[in-house]
Amino acid sequence: MSLNRRILLASPLILTIALAVAANAQAKDPKQIVIGTSAGPYADQVRLGIKPILEKQGYKVRIVEFNDYIQPNFALAEGALDANVFQHVTYLDRFAAQHKLALSELVKVPTAPIAIYSRRHKSLDAVNGGSTVALPNDPTNQARALVMLDQLGWIKLRPGIDPIRASERDVAANPKGIRLLPLEAAQLPRSLQDADYAFVNGNYALASGLKLRDAQRTEKISPAYANLVAVRTPDRDKPFARDLAAAYKSRAFLDVTNKHFADYAKTDYQLALQSPGAR
């Protein structure tokens, strides 16, 4: 989620055409919702769980998949999308402030955690001087990885720092002698061919064929890193936004989550639905 405008899409032209078609269709049909997602599980959540619910209410749902963390917010702000699903509130707030975009959280979604994977080693105990550790290069997700490295004892962060804003500059000691390799989030699964260990965001891990149960250490997701649906701020109370939020909060979507996304961190409203006595 680097906050520059580098686009990692295989074909920007195809995306441009897709967005143009989506925007045009939306102008003709107010019951169409165009949702941008990162490629992989969050697109699958919409496809398997949210789209069927909304279609029963008369909506036409179009999904546009992205392979980077930059363009979905610009596309939303510019009106090519009605909503997007790929980011947590820490990233959304930072990105919106930096680029002066009026975007807001609508509802949290079940989230796949960032985790450490390795194809070279069977356990974290194999770390040694010179081990290469790939991690996200965007500020918010890099901070998550650094905090986990500090918890493992591989590095030591400066006392008193804000963990949400931790950066490589805050590494006070490196007792294991590891070499940090910051990469674009989408490149992290491929880095497992060469790196000893890699922190991979949940959506990219699953999209690349990695399984959450194969991770050697998994983050315990805090509210700051739970993924969400974002909309343009003026649209938060529009009928489509209320219906979209209600779909995510429905028992039907909880059933889809339990069937297809059982290893994900559930939202508070899903946990409430599962509690004894909930109807």
Q: Model-predicted segments: where are they?
A:
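Periplasmic-binding protein-like
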Residues: 143-150, 248-268
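A conserved helix-loop-strand patch within extracytoplasmic ligand-binding domains
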Residues: 106-156, 254
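A bilobed periplasmic-binding-protein/Venus flytrap-type ligand-binding module shared by bacterial periplasmic
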Residues: 113-124, 226-240
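Ligand-binding "clamshell"
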Residues: 94-106, 119-121, 192-194, 199, ...
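Pocket-flanking alpha-helical
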Residues: 69-100, 115, 122, 207-209
